[in-house]
């Protein structure tokens, strides 16, 4: 399979590239060339900033494009304007943060997503991250209604996580003499 991975040299994308290599896919890696630019020397790399000129992608053919770093709907629209006629499938890595409210149990794909009064904002914050990802999803579905796959992962943790959001807790637990937290055996998660 011919894959194009947008992003791919930092955290999640790196692991996607490694799995694609293990599966012997033909990979093109599209990234800025700033973070770990030489991480995959045997993989075709196209260095570009997705916020600038995307012409280097025009006319290229891929079975699937996996977009790991779309944060603003403009980025998704601009990318798909260049590549949508020459790809089989567009995979957008979104987030469970798109959901408008986590106060209810049993959220499904049909649950309402967050919205913004200013849908063209590019101000990233805790309040805008989820709704912006939801707008990115919509941009993908508008461009490729039958050839888009939206993935809404929860917290992604693991080797090379630059946020240290998971490994922080095992270290705290290891160093703590006593830990107090609420016990609710019917809850699917504690926080």
Across the structure, where does each feature detected by a protein language model lie?
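N-terminal Rossmann NAD(P)H-binding glycine-rich loop of SDR-like oxidoreductase domains
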Residues: 3-25
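NAD(P)H-binding glycine-rich loop region in Rossmannoid oxidoreductase-like domains
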Residues: 9, 34-87, 92, 98-101
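Conserved glycine-rich Rossmann-like NAD(P)H-binding loop of the short-chain dehydrogenase/reductase
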Residues: 26-32
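Active-site "gating" loop of Rossmann-like NAD(P)-dependent oxidoreductase/epimerase domains
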Residues: 96-127, 142
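A conserved pocket-lining segment of Rossmann-fold NAD(P)-dependent short-chain dehydrogenase/reductase
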Residues: 121, 172-191
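Active-site YXXXK catalytic motif of short-chain dehydrogenase/reductase
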Residues: 129-133
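Conserved beta-loop-beta element that borders a ligand/cofactor-binding pocket
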Residues: 136-159
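Glycine-rich "substrate-gating" loop/helix at the edge of Rossmann-like oxidoreductase active sites
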Residues: 154-163, 183-191
């Amino acid at each position: 399979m011919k894959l194009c991975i947008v992003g791919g040299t930092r955290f999640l994308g790196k692991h996607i590239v490694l799995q694609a290599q293990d599966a012997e896919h033909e990979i093109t890696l599209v990234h800025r060339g700033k973070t770990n630019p030489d991480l995959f020397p045997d993989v075709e790399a196209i260095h570009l900033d997705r916020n600038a000129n995307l012409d280097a992608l025009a006319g290229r053919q891929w079975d699937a494009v996996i977009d790991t770093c779309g944060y603003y709907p403009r980025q998704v629209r601009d990318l798909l304007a260049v590549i949508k006629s020459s790809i089989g499938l567009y995979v957008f890595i979104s987030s469970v943060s798109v959901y408008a409210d986590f106060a209810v149990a049993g959220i499904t794909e049909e649950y309402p997503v967050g919205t913004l009064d200013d849908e063209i904002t590019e101000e990233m914050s805790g309040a805008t991250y989820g709704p912006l990802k939801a707008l990115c999803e919509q941009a993908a579905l508008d461009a490729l209604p039958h050839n888009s796959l939206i993935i809404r992962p929860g917290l992604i943790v693991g080797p090379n996580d630059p946020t240290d959001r998971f490994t922080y807790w095992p270290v705290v637990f290891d160093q703590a003499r006593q830990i107090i937290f609420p016990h609710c055996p019917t809850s699917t998660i504690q926080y």
